Curated annotation (Swiss-Prot):
Entry keywords, A to Z: Cytoplasm, Phosphoprotein
Domain of life of the native organism: Eukaryota
Spans annotated as Disordered: 216-240, 372-405, 574-631, 762-846
Comp. bias intervals (Basic and acidic residues): 372-382, 583-603
Gene: Nop17l
Family of this protein: Belongs to the PIH1 family. Kintoun subfamily.
UniProt GO MF annotations: protein phosphatase 1 binding
Residues with the Phosphoserine modification: 380, 780
Protein name listed in UniProt: Protein kintoun
Self-association state and partner proteins as the record states: Interacts with Pp1alpha-96A, Pp1-87B, Pp1-13C and flw.
Compartment(s): Cytoplasm
The keyword Nucleus belongs to this UniProt entry's keyword annotation: no
GO terms for biological process, alphabetical: axonemal dynein complex assembly; cilium-dependent cell motility
Length: 846
């Protein structure tokens, strides 16, 4: 703003010769009072007349000449004599006059024979001396401000200009060049006028000074301080006058002049733009209207010109003699040309055009911003939620559950434009490319193509579908906002004549385009397809994947067929051998004809068909069967009570390996597919943080052995949920129940928007590792002593139990775990057996 204001002040000072008048208020009041007196005004007018008197001016010039001669300077006063006047415009804003005058004090014009270097023709080369006066302000016939310049030549030059038009034009060009070069202005040469005036204004003499050829005696005397300064070297010769360079090529004069103009953005104050709404500053950069100001100093009114305004341009044309203007201006915004206003200021000779700007609606602006944001978006590899939620930090104590899965952005299907077959599909003026990589998969009667082309515009997808072929074209926008066009033609193989395309669906994603072809129900699954840029450039490609939903369903049905499970009791080894094989069709038909009691028995046998896992200790690799649990003594309680002879020890025979797990014989196969909410973990491993504590049996064993009071099933599923607490099982041991308590503390994760996701993930992983090592160190220090003490007491109790089993009156056969499977009363009353059972349960877990 300050630069433009300073430029405006300099221009006004240059055009008007305004000088700063330093006058105080007191001095201004004194001058005002003096002019109010009649005596002072009379004296002032007498002074003006004395100055303007020619006799007095002559005496004044003689005195000045004598004074300058005493100083060694020759002074000549030049009095311009009228010649002719040139009228034009100064910088396209101000009217100006150039007086072509004559004076005897100026040297005569000289010529010499010269040869034109461009054409080789001989001619005369003129040297025209001239003199210029300072510019002055004046008024025109309508009392408007104007500028006046004087250019003085010798009278012989004016005489030649009257007789020769070429010399006259040369004189005019010389005067115009002198004014532009001296005052750094631009003159309108296309609109030159020659009014019927000999001279504009009052002639003012000018002075030419030069050193005197014959200096006076006083000037020849040395200066008293001349010896103190070094002498100036003498000039090599007589100084020659300055010669202006002659133009080798004439300046082309345009037929029409481009007037000066300015475009101003007008914006009124709207209080709605100062609110906190999202769309408050949507139009803050768009002006309310455009004001176009055109300077026309040579026109009297707008009737002499033609003005045409459109939504994006302004056109001005004037062909009046002496005022030829032509302007074609492009506007920065779309305007309403029907609601515009134009006004011509006759004093300033300025045309002002006010045009209201057409603003887009809020919906169109939002759509445009979304499109630009989509084109300029850089994929950072991080998916953000649509509601601007920050991603949750990973759980430091454990991984998140499967229910908190990642949510991927789902693109809406794109409705592609369908063209008719008779119209040309691909444009001849556009270069199309075939996608460099594409895949094809077939699922039943649907062919899915994945075209790996990123940043596809959904609006550019067009397709041409026929009975056995499809032609697709689309465009992408790169980083330079330059569109790239692609085309893809696919055709079904010729061997499948019955195949036909029923429907087509094209979806534009961020990194690819998914094309789905739905074939008719009679179509066979193709093993290959033809693809290319168009029908003339086809190549056969194989189908990568073929999937049949019906066939896979039958295979799964066969795999899920019931298995045949057999149990063989070994009396000598007191062990139970389990044989599992797939059942035949005859056995299945026979099993369907069995009665309900046999079905119950079959369910009891199928509850043992799942493999039981075993955990072995890391040091001695000691094997122990899972059937030695606290609840195994109730599995065959009723059958063994009736037949006391068959009381073997139930043990699964599996090869020796470390960290085995098997299903218990008390497991029910019907509910084996359900999983409980309790975490299965090792005693010495890290514990999940989702629960504070569990029962003693959960701390010791990786499998559930809880008992419920139902008559049909005495035991819960090994991997089932938490059993309901019932009053009927109050007599059972509390260690056979699953209990869990949840912590009331809520973990809160905070994610900073300015932090790096990879850096935050590394920090969380390091924190989890430190916490895990500290927890393992605490467990290893406290549990090692407890384990040795528990193991010693358990071994002693096992020896006592083996002695009781060898007694003849015992009548009970015990497992090596100390549990009575016969259901004898003496076994339940023995308190040592219960302690041994719990001790060995702790020993089973590694």
């Amino acid at each position: 703003m300050s630069a433009s204001a300073a430029r405006s002040r300099n221009k006004q000072s240059k055009l008007r010769d305004d000088e700063q008048l330093d006058i105080s208020k007191d001095e201004f009041n004194r001058i005002q009072e003096a002019f109010g007196r009649e005596e002072f005004r009379k004296l002032f007018f007498d002074y003006v007349e004395e100055i303007q008197d020619p006799e007095n001016r002559k005496i004044y010039e003689e005195e000045i000449t004598q004074l300058e001669k005493e100083r060694g300077v020759e002074v000549r006063f030049i009095h311009p004599k009228p010649g002719f006047v040139i009228k034009t415009a100064l910088d396209g804003e101000l009217k100006c006059f150039i007086n072509i005058a004559g004076s005897e004090e100026i040297e005569r014009p000289k010529n010499e024979v010269a040869t034109d270097p461009s054409s080789g023709s001989r001619g005369l080369s003129w040297s025209i001396p001239m003199a210029q006066t300072s510019s002055r302000d004046d008024c025109d016939a309508k009392n408007n401000h104007c500028k006046v310049f004087d250019v003085v030549f010798h009278p012989d030059a004016l005489h030649l200009a009257k007789r020769n038009k070429q010399f006259r034009q040369c004189l005019i060009d010389t005067a115009l060049d002198a004014v532009e070069r001296e005052y750094k202005v631009s003159l309108d040469r296309a609109n030159l006028k020659f009014p019927k005036l000999d001279y504009k204004g009052i002639p003012r003499p000018t002075v030419i000074r030069k050193l005197a050829d014959n200096p006076t005696a006083e000037e020849q005397e040395p200066h008293p301080l001349a010896h103190m300064f070094p002498t100036k070297p003498p000039a090599p010769g007589k100084p020659e006058p300055r010669v202006l360079p002659m133009k080798t090529k004439p300046t082309p004069v345009p037929e029409f002049t481009v007037p000066r103009y300015s475009i101003k953005h007008s914006h009124d104050v709207d209080l709605s733009e100062y609110t906190d709404e999202l769309d408050a500053k949507l139009h803050v950069t768009v002006p309310r209207s455009l004001v176009v100001e055109i300077e026309l100093p040579l026109l009297r009114s707008t009737a002499e010109c033609q003005l045409d305004v459109t939504s994006k341009s302004v056109y001005l044309f004037s062909e009046r003699q002496g005022a030829k203007y032509r302007l074609k201006l492009d506007l920065p915004f779309s305007v309403d040309d029907k609601a515009g206003q134009a006004r011509f200021d006759t004093d300033m000779r300025r045309l002002s055009i006010t045009l209201p700007v057409v603003r887009k609606s809020t919906k169109e602006e939002a759509q445009m911003h979304d499109t630009l944001r989509h084109f300029s978006r850089e994929d950072s590899g991080v998916e953000l939620h649509s509601n601007s939620e920050s991603p949750v930090e990973e759980d430091p104590d454990g991984e998140l559950s499967d229910s908190k899965a990642d949510i991927s952005e789902i693109s809406s299907p794109t409705t592609a434009t369908v063209r008719l077959a008779n119209s040309p599909f691909l444009k001849n003026s556009v270069h199309y490319q075939l996608p460099s990589k594409f895949d094809c998969n077939v699922l039943d009667n649907v062919m899915a193509f994945v075209l790996h082309v990123p940043n596809v515009q959904p609006d550019s997808i067009e397709q041409l579908r026929e009975q056995r072929s499809l032609h697709l074209q689309f465009a992408t926008i790169g980083s330079g906002y330059y569109p790239t066009h692609y085309a893809f033609y696919v055709e079904l193989p010729a061997e499948h004549e019955d195949s036909a395309i029923e429907s087509v669906e094209a979806e534009a994603w961020d990194n690819n385009v998914v094309l789905k072809l739905c074939l008719s129900s009679q179509s066979e699954t193709p093993a290959s397809y033809l693809a290319g840029l168009d029908a003339t450039e086809l190549k056969e490609y194989p189908v990568h994947g073929q999937y049949n939903v019906k066939s896979s369903g039958k295979a799964n049905a066969k795999e899920n067929a019931p298995l045949d499970v057999k149990f063989v009791h070994n009396q000598e080894g007191q062990a139970l051998k389990v044989t599992i094989r797939p059942g035949t069709k005859e056995e299945e038909e026979k099993g369907n004809q069995d009665q309900e009691p046999e079905s119950d028995k079959q369910h009891q046998q199928q509850s043992q068909n799942k493999k039981a896992g075993k955990k072995q200790r890391k040091r001695n690799k000691k094997e122990r069967s899972l059937s030695e649990s606290a609840c195994a003594d109730m599995i065959f309680q009723e059958p063994l009570a009736k037949n006391p002879e068959l009381q073997p020890k139930t043990m699964f025979k599996f090869p020796s390996q470390r960290k085995q797990r098997s299903y218990s014989e008390c497991n029910d196969s019907i509910g084996g597919s359900h999983r409980g909410i309790l975490k299965r973990f090792s005693r010495y491993g890290p514990r999940p943080s989702m629960s504070d504590s569990c029962s003693s049996i959960d701390d010791c064993s990786s499998y559930s052995c809880s008992v419920d009071a139902s008559g049909t099933s005495l035991f819960s599923h090994s991997f089932g949920g938490i059993p309901e607490e019932d009053r009927s099982d109050a007599g059972l041991s509390e260690s056979c129940k699953k209990t869990v308590r949840f912590n009331d503390h809520i973990m809160k994760q905070v994610f900073r928007l300015d932090s790096s996701i990879l850096g935050q993930r590394k920090k969380n992983q390091k924190r989890r590792d430190l916490k895990l090592r500290a927890q393992q160190r605490r467990l290893s220090e406290g549990d090692s002593v407890d384990y040795e003490e528990t193991r010693g007491s358990a071994l002693k109790q096992q020896e006592n139990q083996s002695r009781n089993c060898n007694k003849p009156n015992g009548g009970s056969v015990l497992h090596d775990s100390g549990l009575d499977l016969t259901g004898a009363p003496g076994a339940h009353s023995n308190h040592n057996e219960s302690e041994a059972k719990n001790a060995l349960m702790f020993e089973m877990d590694d």
